[in-house]
């Protein structure tokens, strides 16, 4: 099992808007077949840490890649991405972890 995280660094004062947009992303991911998608808000972190995190689980990398491909090719995602870019100080970074239980 894998968990994918997208880290978002927001423009000051825009974290609330980013979280609303990430909830829209969550809905799009679920439509694309994603599981356990959720939005995390940074409560306390070291300097330079992301302000918001989008997280989703996938059983394997192939499934994750298929979901990402399906999502990013949609017009809805393209419009969403354009809106999001004005709320961020930098492009989001993706991290993929193996869940080791």
List each language-model region with its residue ranges.
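Absolute protein N-terminus
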Residues: 1-2, 101
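Short, well-ordered beta-strand segments in beta-rich or mixed alpha/beta enzyme
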Residues: 2-9, 38-72
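Short, surface-exposed ligand-recognition loops at beta-strand->loop->(often short) alpha-helix junctions
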Residues: 9-20
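Residues that cap or initiate secondary-structure elements
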Residues: 12-14, 60-62, 100
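Intrinsically disordered, low-complexity segments enriched in polar/charged residues with Gly/Pro
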Residues: 14-15, 42-44, 83-84
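An amphipathic, aromatic/His-enriched active-site/gating alpha helix that lines ligand/cofactor pockets
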Residues: 20-38, 57-94
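Short, low-order "capping/linker" segments at domain edges
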Residues: 95-101
């Amino acid at each position: 099992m894998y968990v994918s995280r997208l880290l978002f660094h927001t423009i000051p004062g825009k974290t609330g808007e980013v979280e609303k947009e990430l909830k829209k992303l969550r809905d799009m991911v679920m439509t694309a077949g994603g599981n356990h998608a959720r939005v995390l808000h940074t409560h306390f972190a070291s300097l330079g840490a992301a302000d918001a995190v989008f997280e989703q689980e996938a059983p394997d990398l192939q499934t994750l890649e298929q979901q990402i491909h399906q999502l990013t090719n949609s017009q809805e995602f393209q419009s969403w991405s354009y809106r999001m870019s004005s709320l961020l100080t930098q492009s989001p970074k993706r991290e993929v972890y193996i869940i080791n239980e």
